C-alpha cells in the first residue's frame, strides 16, 4: 500500500472551537493500493485549497473475499467543508470495481466507488453535523470507475465553473456521472443551482436519484434530491439516461430530480449506459417500482429562442418524461436509433410554460416503414405522434410543435407547424387541417450553398477605394514608391445563407509617377475561415492588380484599378442527423473599379470629399463533386456571379503638413450579385439554390495617414457597414508606404 500527500504550502491553520480549517495551496494527493483506496478521507474536517487540487487514486473494489472495498477520490462526510478556489482534477482507477454492497446487492455498489463523494451530513447516527459541502470555484475534471459526482444525505457538491466528468459503464452494477440521494449536485449553475453559467460541461454517464427508504440509515426525506446541470455552450454534452426512483415509485413529494439547462446547441444523448437496474431485494413493497423505465426530468429549460435551443438525441426506445418544460429544444431521431422505431422514443411533457416549443427532426430513411413521404402530411403525422403533451388534457395550450423531416441528402425537407389544438384527447400530437405543411431546402443544400457564398465574400473583402489602398497620396512626394498593407476583418451573411467569415490578407505594391498619374501594380495573398450553420470551411486567395490614380490641381482625383484573383475553398457541412458533405472548389475572379471625387478644401485644413465609385466584378462558376460520409457523391454546379456595385460617398477630414484624418459615409447599392447553384445525385431529384445579394447599404469609414519620416508614412482605415446582406462587422486596413 502506498498513500502520499504532497502539500506545496500550508498557508494557515485556524482553530475555531473543535474544528479546524486548513488552508493549502497547490496540492497533489496520491493513494495506490491493492484494495480499499481513498485519496482525501474527510470526516468532519474543514479544508480550504487556494490553488488547484489533483487527486490520483487506484485500488481494487473486489479482492479475494472482499467484494465492496471503497475506491474513491474525495470522500467527505459528517459535515466536512471543502473549498477549492481553483480547479480540481480527480482520477480513479479500479480494475475490479465493487459488485455489491455489504448485503451483496448490486444496487448498493455505487456507495463504494466515486470520483467525488459528499454525504452523511446533518443528523446521523454519528450526531448532529452540519451539511457536508464541497465547493469548486473553477472547473472539475473527473475520470472515475463508478460514480463521478455523488451527493448523499445532506451533501452538497457545487462546481461553479465547467466540468468534464467521465465514467465507465460496467456490466456488474449501474453507474452514474452524477448521483443524488437526498443530496445536491450543481454544475455550472451557481450556488443555488438556478443560475446557469457559460462554461463547457461534459457529463458521460447516467444521472441518478436514489430513494434510500430501506435498510439501515434511511433518509428522513426532509427535502428533495437535486441535480442541476448547466449545458449552455455548443461544446457541452450529456450522454446517459436519467433514473429517478422517486418518480418511478410515484412518490416524489418534494419534486426532486434533474434540472437541465439545455441551450445554445448543447446536446443530451439519451441512452442508458452500462448495466440495467436490477430488482432491489430488501425492504421495498414493490421492487419493480424502482427499475429504470425511461428518463425522467423534473425541469428542462431550453433556449430562450429557437436559435439558441439545445438538442436531445433520442436513442433509448423508452420514453423521456419531462415534468416541467420551458424554452425551445430540438429532438433528433437518427437512423438506427431504437427511439426512431414506430411507437418508440416518446417524449412526454406534463407541463409547458407559455411560448415554449419542441422541434422533431429525423429522416424518412430513419423512420423507415411508417414514414411515407409521397402522401402530404402522412409521414409528418406518424412522426409527430412521438410527442405527448399531458398539459393539453388539463387545459394548457402552451406547447408549440414543429417537424423537420429529411427526405434525402439534397431532396427538400418536409416541415409541419402544428396549431395549439393539434393534439388528441390523450394529449398526443397529430397533424390536422390546421397544421401548416411546407417544404424547404435540405440542411445539406443550405450548408453547401453557404460554402459557395464564401467565395463571393472573399471577393467583397478585397474591394477598396483610394484611401484604403494608398492612404493620402498627397503625402507622396517622390516619383516612385513601394507599399505594403494588412487587411483583416469579419463579415457574415444571415439572409438566404449563413456564413460567418474571418479573413486576413497581405498586399504589397509598387508604383511610379507619370505626370499627374500614379501608375502601379500590387500582389495580394490571404486566407479565411468560415463557419456555417452546420459546418465550417477555409479558403485562400491570391491576386494581382494594376492601378492608376490621377490627381488634378483643383483637388479632383480619378482612381482606376483592375484585379484578377484565384480563390480556393474547402468545406464540410452536415445536417442535424449526422450526414456530412465535404468538397473543395476553385474560382477565378476579375474586377474593375473606377472612383472619381474631389477634395474641396476649407479653412484651417478642413475639407469635404464627395466621391462616386463603380465596381464591376465577375466570379467564375465551378462544377465539382462533393462526397458524403456515407460514400455517395453530390455533383454541384455553381453559375458565375456578376456584380455591379455603385457607391456615392461624402467625406469630411482635416489635413496638416504631415498627416490627414477623415470620416466617410457612402451609400452603396448592388445591382446584380445573384448566385445560382444546382445539386444532383443518384436516386434523388435535382435541386437548385439561389443567394440574392442585390441590396442597398451604408458604408462607414474612419481613417488617416501620418508621415513620420520625409519619405515614409503610415496609413489605415476602419470600415463597417450597416444594413447589408453581406454584413461587414469590421474591416481594418493598415499600411506603410515608402517613396524614393
Predicted segments, located by residue:
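Extracellular beta-strand/beta-solenoid scaffold signature
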Residues: 28-43, 56-79, 95-124, 130-133, ...
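Outer-envelope beta-barrel architecture signal
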Residues: 199-201, 236, 478-482, 504, ...
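Outer-membrane translocation/initiation segment of Type V secreted surface proteins
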Residues: 21-22, 327-345, 359-511, 587
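Extracellular beta-strand/loop-rich repeat segments of large surface/secreted proteins
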Residues: 200-204, 208-386
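Outer membrane beta-barrel transmembrane domains
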Residues: 545-550, 602, 635-740
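Solvent-exposed, glycine/polar-rich loop segments of beta-barrel outer-membrane systems
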Residues: 496-502, 533-535, 568-586, 620-642, ...
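Outer membrane beta-barrel translocator domains of Type V secretion systems
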Residues: 439-604, 718-719, 724, 735-737
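Residue-level detector of the transmembrane beta-barrel scaffold of outer-membrane proteins
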Residues: 206, 241, 481-485, 518-522, ...
